[in-house]
Amino acid sequence: MGQVFLLMPVLLVSCFLGQGAAMENQRLFNIAVNRVQHLHLLAQKMFNDFEGTLLPDERRQLNKIFLLDFCNSDSIVSPIDKQETQKSSVLKLLHISFRLIESWEYPSQTLTISNSLMVRNSNQISEKLSDLKVGINLLIKGSQDGVLSLDDNDSQHLPPYGNYYQNLGGDGNVRRNYELLACFKKDMHKVETYLTVAKCRKYLEANCTL
């Protein structure tokens, strides 16, 4: 009987520690989702502002080219539709989100558009991407109970954006900026979707449908 009473405080402490870790993990999820939502909105605004500087014919032509082209980050394997996203594990969605954010750390520094607001935004974006990458890595560690973490050996190395755009013609700067902004907007929407679904699945929220 005495041993039972001695074990009770230990069990209570373990229970409280477990609850504390779960609450901290949920807090990190909320922060990550809020940050990527902000990045997505910022990417949408930058893209819309840039489109507003183009002539209608130029905008239509660039949109046609972009629909036939692909983004540098498309080499990262990710769900192809809503159904596949819903079926993916929380850990898989976190890993893909990490890769997508990581793929934009360097390109985000090259959004040098001749607009002071956009240049300030590009600097702000680089910082937010780095913070979000750290946050997602913490979520991955929490989901794996700290057994594994993402390191350099586990990274998918993407081709540099400089090579990706080196064959563009005389209007390369305009097309390059258009595609960078369009791809950034697309990828931030992906990460927002994946983190939202992962959070919903992790904490069994009422409606996880897309």
Swiss-Prot record:
InterPro entries in UniProt: 4_helix_cytokine-like_core (IPR009079), Somatotropin (IPR034975), Somatotropin/Prolactin (IPR001400), Somatotropin_CS (IPR018116)
Gene Ontology BP annotations: animal organ development; calcium ion homeostasis; chloride ion homeostasis; growth hormone receptor signaling pathway; hyperosmotic salinity response; magnesium ion homeostasis; negative regulation of testosterone secretion; positive regulation of gene expression
PROSITE patterns, per database record: SOMATOTROPIN_1, SOMATOTROPIN_2
GO molecular function terms noted in the UniProt entry: growth hormone activity; growth hormone receptor binding; metal ion binding
Zinc is among the record's keywords: yes
Subcellular location: Secreted
Top-level taxon in the UniProt lineage: Eukaryota
Residues holding Zn(2+): 38, 192
Entry keyword Secreted: yes
Gene3D superfamilies found in the cross-reference section: 1.20.1250.10
Pfam families: Hormone_1
Keywords, ordered alphabetically: Disulfide bond, Hormone, Metal-binding, Secreted, Signal, Zinc
Disulfide bridge map: 71-183, 200-208
Residues annotated as signal peptide: 1-22
Primary localization: secreted
Family: Belongs to the somatotropin/prolactin family.
Function: Growth hormone plays an important role in growth control and is involved in the regulation of several anabolic processes. Implicated as an osmoregulatory substance important for seawater adaptation.
Protein name, as recorded: Somatotropin-2
